Amino acid sequence: MEIILKYFPDLTEEQRKQFAALYDLYIDWNSKINVISRKDIENLYEHHVLHSLGITKTIQFRPGTSIMDLGTGGGFPGIPLAILFPEVTFHLVDSIGKKVRVATEVANAIGLKNVTFRHARAEEEKRTFDFVVSRAVMPLADLIKIIKKNISSKQQNALPNGLICLKGGELEHETMPFKHKTVIYNLSDSFEEEFFQTKKVVYVPI
C-alpha cells in the first residue's frame, strides 16, 4: 500500500481505505479462484495496482467519462482506476466468468459504485465508450479491430477517444501499422521500481 501513497499522496480517506482493502480481498479470492499468479500475489500493489494506475500518466479522465476495461481478469486495470476516478464510469468485461465474479465481489466489498461488469467476449459488447483500456490482452492490431465499434464519437477529454493499453517489452513491430498516431509512454519515467523498466502505456486515438 505504501507504494501507492508514494506516487499518489493526495488520495482521499475513502480512496486510501479502498486501496488498503484490496490486499486481503485478493489474497482471499485468489486462494479460491486463481486470477493472479500465486507467486506474484505478494507483489499485488506494485505489479497490479500501481501498474494499472500507470494509465494516469497519459490522461486524467474528466468526470462523466465512460471507459470499458477489456479482458479485465480479476479487475485490472479497471478497479484501481475506478477507485482513483470516482466520477468516471467503468465497464469491466471478461470472457471468463469466474474472473468476472472475483472482480465483482472485490468491487462490491470496497463499495465501488462506478463499475459494472459483464461476462462476455469482446465481440459481444456493442455499447460505446470514450476509451477502452486493456492490459496486454492481445496484439494491438487485433484489439483495435475488435474495439473500433465501441469508441464513441463524442469527445470530452484532453485526448481524443481511443484505446489505452498497458504493454511490456519491444513494441515496434506491434505498433508499426499505427506508428503515425500511436503514442508510447515509458512507465520507467514515472515509477522508479525495476518492474517498470520495460513497461509502457500505449495510446491509439480511434
Where does each model-flagged region fall?
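N-terminal auxiliary segments of SAM/dcSAM-dependent transferases
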Residues: 1-38, 42
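A short, conserved alpha-helix within the catalytic core of class I
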Residues: 140-150
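Conserved SAM/SAH cofactor-binding pocket of Class I
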Residues: 53-134, 144
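Conserved S-adenosyl-L-methionine
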Residues: 83-89, 151-154, 158
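Conserved beta-strand signature within the Rossmann-like core of class I S-adenosyl-L-methionine
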Residues: 156-170
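Conserved hydrophobic residues forming the short capping helix/wall of the S-adenosyl-L-methionine
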Residues: 30, 106-107, 151
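Conserved alpha-helix/loop element of class I SAM-dependent methyltransferases that forms part
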Residues: 28, 32, 45-63
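Active-site capping/gating segments
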Residues: 168-206
